[in-house]
Amino acid sequence: MRGYFVVLEGIDGSGKTTQAKLLAEWFEEQGWDVLLTKEPTDTEFGRLIRELVLKNSIIDGSRISYEAEALLFAADRAEHVKKVILPALEKGKVVICDRYLYSSLAYQWARGLSLEWLMQINSFAPRPDLAILLDLPVKESIRRTKARGNMSEFDKLLELQRKVRMNYLKLAEMFKEMRIVNAMASVEEVHEDIVALVKHELLGL
């Protein structure tokens, strides 16, 4: 039997990593074999993304172009899908991914790139069974990110974060597999809401 593919999305500070871990633990308690993964990955492409994009590195006197950035993320995702996600699903595992296709669409669309083009270069990426958007006001996102001492270039750009959040909400209307969870609630309450979604949408409970 094919496994389930679940993605957690949201702006910085929305609790994706924490909730992905909690959901993985919950599935394991139910007897499932679980693969917890993330994007960018730990592959060579993921390393390039961290060095050239997330650290805002300069190449030949200028920042990497947004088009090149989008293609790097797509290349990393292609490797991830072919070598990690699909093989795990074929083995019947539950794959839980911290960020996926929707991150690329939301962030790079906010950078001014064409949504149609972004979807085209990511057309190889299989849609998950369930994509959970942890929605959070931008001011709370910035507060949480500052509190953990992890301010990146993305986090500093308040207007960008506003655009990204708006884009995520638009994507939730476009993609039938996306569901929104209020990330302002406590960690425990958010986890309970996610489990309720999984039971209803995937397991028919």
Curated annotation (Swiss-Prot):
> Could you name the Gene Ontology cellular component terms for this entry?
cytoplasm
The GO terms describing molecular function are: ATP binding; dTMP kinase activity
Q: Is-annotated flag, keyword Kinase?
A: yes
- For this protein, the Enzyme Commission number is 2.7.4.9
Which chemical reaction does it catalyze? dTMP + ATP = dTDP + ADP
Q: Name one GO biological process term.
A: dTTP biosynthetic process
* Transferase keyword on record: yes
Sorted alphabetically, which InterPro entries does this protein's record hold? P-loop_NTPase, Thymidylate_kin-like_dom, Thymidylate_kin_CS, Thymidylate_kinase
Q: Which family does it belong to?
A: Belongs to the thymidylate kinase family.
Specify the protein name: Probable thymidylate kinase
| Source organism (scientific name) | Pyrococcus abyssi (strain GE5 / Orsay)
Instruction: State the taxonomy lineage.
Output: Archaea, Methanobacteriati, Methanobacteriota, Thermococci, Thermococcales
